[in-house]
Amino acid sequence: MFIGYLLLILAIFGFYYSIQQINGSSIFKKKNLLDDWISKQNTISFNSILKNINPSGTPRGFVAASLSTSYPDYFYTWTRDAALVVRVLSDLPETDDDVLKDYIDFQIHIQNTPTVCHCLGEPKFNPDGTGYTGSWGRPQNDGPAERAITFIKIANRLKNSAYVSQKIVPALEKDLDYILQVWEQPCFDLWEEVDGVHFYTLMAMQRALLDAFDFFNLSKYRSTAYRIQEKIERFWSSEENYIRVTHEVREGANKPSGLDVSVLMAANMFATTREGFFTPGSDKVLATAAAIEKSFSSIYPINKNLQPDLGVAIGRYPEDVYDGYGSSKGNPWFLTTAAYVELYYLAMKEWKQTGLQINAVNKPFFERFLPIDDHCIYYSPDSQQLKEIINLVSLEADKFLATIQYHQQRNGSMSEQYSRYDGYMQGARDLTWSHAAFISAIKAREGNSVAF
């Protein structure tokens, strides 16, 4: 045990020393510069989101995925994107309540709009509020679950008002009833490419039902949530030491690795520390994070010979072929890179509360920057060793932020993707979800998670 602690101390000393030598200035100065950028970017991202809500010619409450109308055309609203964006806005005191109410009103409208799939899992709607009728991956059943989560967040913010009881509750119950009906059925994933049973979708559903139990105190929601959790457990692959993204694939993109950053996004957004179920700091999620990062570090040219203060650029999944315009080779995304920032900081928050055990499952996560032997080691919440580990992991988390800063435009714009070859932005301009993901990551960095 003593030798393990000694190695840890030596590793930490060497880590700090090497960074200072390579960068030629202290890490603290770099942190101050990063903090200054974060403060400015937070404001830019907030305003960018508002700019994409109710743009000219659209109904109030319409949340555009992007203002880009060609190459690519993202001037639509997705149930998922809108819910996840407004979920973040509802957590910010500077958000006007009218913005949230407009979102609710528009969502109630599209709940009752005729659609091709004749269900609440219709993913995409036109700028005039009508359903999109073109060929698409339908249904996408994470959408109603994410909307229910956001409805409950808004209801809790607005307290016991007539608006909550008369407007939000009936619409919320409609989404919850839908989840109870369809949770066992395959559907398309959040990337709209694979028809099957998905870790992300099930995590969204179980979180919506757990929140609903807290809100309504009805046992049917909790009992179904626990049944969903039993199904989610099966996504863990002990042979591969990571969580596979999809089971029971019926059609769609080929993902032989089974790796997908949406697994980590699900942990960030839908896990609860109270339940302790696939949380960001849990062994299996950390192991999955390590496997995904390792994969992207090898397949993206911009991840070769990285500057020491930059983190690995993260995409959706290794086999991705969507380049933001068409099919070729997939790229890193801003929102997926931000997911790593959020994951790391949420994990650190857990360790501060419960302590940390390094074991055979999560070893791949920690062995990248710590000397790890084959023994399980537990660090208590108040131990100096854990504090030093957290310092190391926070430096690694901030490298992902530095990557976002490095590849965005100087004016704070963030598109959907940035090139795997040269890092320049491509795809839909100022993707609303990119900006929301950044704000959510910074909330986690500040210790004020949107999720929990």
Curated annotation (Swiss-Prot):
Keyword hit for Secreted: yes
Molecular function GO terms recorded: glucan 1,4-alpha-glucosidase activity
EC number(s) given by UniProt: 3.2.1.3
Keyword Secreted: yes
Primary residence: secreted
Induction (UniProt): Expressed in presence of arabinose, cellobiose, fructose, glucose, glycerol, maltose, pullulan, soluble starch, or xylose.
Record function comment: Consecutively hydrolyzes alpha(1-4) glycosidic bonds from the non-reducing ends of starch, resulting in the production of glucose. It also has a limited ability to produce glucose through the hydrolysis of amylopectin alpha(1-6) linkages.
Name of the protein in its database record: Glucoamylase amyD
UniProt lineage: Eukaryota, Fungi, Fungi incertae sedis, Mucoromycota, Mucoromycotina
